[in-house]
UniProtKB/Swiss-Prot annotation:
Its main location: membrane. This is Putative protein ARB2BP. It is found in: Membrane. It comes from Homo sapiens (Human). The gene is ARB2BP. It comes from the Eukaryota. The chain crosses the membrane at residues 229-245. One of its GO terms (biological process) is regulatory ncRNA-mediated heterochromatin formation. Coiled coil: none annotated. Keywords: Membrane, Transmembrane, Transmembrane helix.
Length: 362
């Protein structure tokens, strides 16, 4: 995956080579370039603030690196929203495959991540650093989908605002030694100082994960005709999907054939209430994979969640649940799509010789 694009080049350009001598090896694991050991947080011995800033700088570099992989390895297109916004205006964006909106002969897969500091293309920043790209990034999922002839849209629900001071300080981190820039950040009362939070500039149409998702649904996804749509949602993404279902019920119910939820944070009682139609729809179109000591796919329902089938993700680690359940999820999609196609075909009018004659004589 990483042969085409080295993460070390990003670090070299940032002038943080002394503090971050890391790259992804042939197994896509994040390792020290000299010792081949896993990432060590405590680089500055027992200096929490400096180690935290180093970790945040690493997270920012990983964010940009994953964006590059989405475009250059997965061949996805970066789409800014809203399209009419001036280039100087803070804008959000998402990624999609080349013919995601126009290819009527393939299903469309939409990825909706958990809430956190990470951005499009990541299930978990922590999983990327400690378990590698195969487990923490969305790239294996995207590649699997493309190989199965899905089109793909990768949402970016956590890209909600710009912090002017932080933007300048990131540039400082990316052009200066981290020790000297850390001092400037503390003196300046920056983002990293709890006493002086920065003023945030919200990104239009993407103030929240819910708004980001609804906007892309309204202005992009809903415009597709004849597309069978599936969602993979993780954590808070499950709550965001249920919000979309409530807001755009008829469109979502007619277009979406399957939803794979992973350790979802949705709340059916609060979000769907006692709506009989919505409850019936999720029962037949949703399945959830949850962290569990049970083997993958074994039933794992709880007394709190019984609204649709729940199975084990095959792991007890939250950050590994998406990668652990991926093969099972695609099997579920294949079966659900086949069932949807069969139902649609069975509802088509059967043209007989007698019906043709009646039509001609009418």
């Amino acid at each position: 995956m990483t042969q085409e694009l080295s993460f070390q080049k990003f670090i070299e350009q940032s002038d943080l080579l002394g503090e971050l001598k890391y790259d992804f090896n042939e197994k896509d694991e994040f390792r020290h370039t000299e010792t081949q050991r896993p990432f060590v947080f405590n680089y500055y011995e027992n200096v929490l603030e400096k180690n935290s800033k180093r970790y945040q700088a690493l997270g920012h570099l990983l964010e940009q690196y994953i964006y590059e992989l989405l475009e250059k390895v997965c061949k996805l297109e970066k789409v800014y929203i809203p399209p009419e916004a001036d280039k100087e205006e803070p804008r959000s964006f998402f990624f999609m495959s080349e013919k995601a909106l126009t290819n009527h002969h393939s299903a469309l897969l939409i990825l909706l991540q958990d809430h956190g500091v990470f951005r499009a293309g990541q299930w978990s920043q922590q999983a990327i650093i400690h378990h590698g790209l195969q487990h923490g990034s969305q790239i294996p999922c995207i590649q699997m989908a493309l190989q199965a002839h899905y089109d793909v849209i990768v949402l970016n629900p956590n890209d909600n605002f710009v912090e002017p001071k932080v933007e300048k300080e990131w540039k400082g981190l990316l052009t200066q030694n981290i020790e000297s820039s850390s001092l400037k950040m503390v003196q300046g009362g920056s983002f990293f100082s709890l006493q002086h939070p920065p003023k945030c500039i919200p990104k239009r149409c993407s103030n929240t994960p819910e708004e980001h998702t609804a906007y892309i649904w309204d202005y992009f996804i809903s415009k597709t005709e004849g597309k069978d749509i599936a969602f993979i949602v993780h954590g808070y993404g499950g709550l965001v999907f249920m919000d979309l279902l409530v807001r755009r019920r008829w469109e979502v119910m007619s277009k979406v054939y399957a939803v794979a939820l992973i350790d979802s944070e949705h709340h059916v009682g609060h979000q769907l209430g006692s709506d009989v139609q919505l409850l019936a729809w999720i029962k037949h179109h949703c399945r959830e994979w949850v962290t569990s000591p049970k083997p993958l796919d074994k039933p794992a329902a709880t007394v709190f969640k019984k609204e649709f089938p729940m199975v084990s993700a095959g792991t007890e680690k939250y950050i590994l649940a998406p990668s652990s359940s991926l093969q099972s999820i695609f099997k579920y999609f294949k079966k659900a799509l086949k069932a949807r196609t069969t139902i649609n075909f069975s509802r088509m009018p059967i043209v007989t010789r007698s019906s043709t004659k009646r039509k001609q004589s009418a």
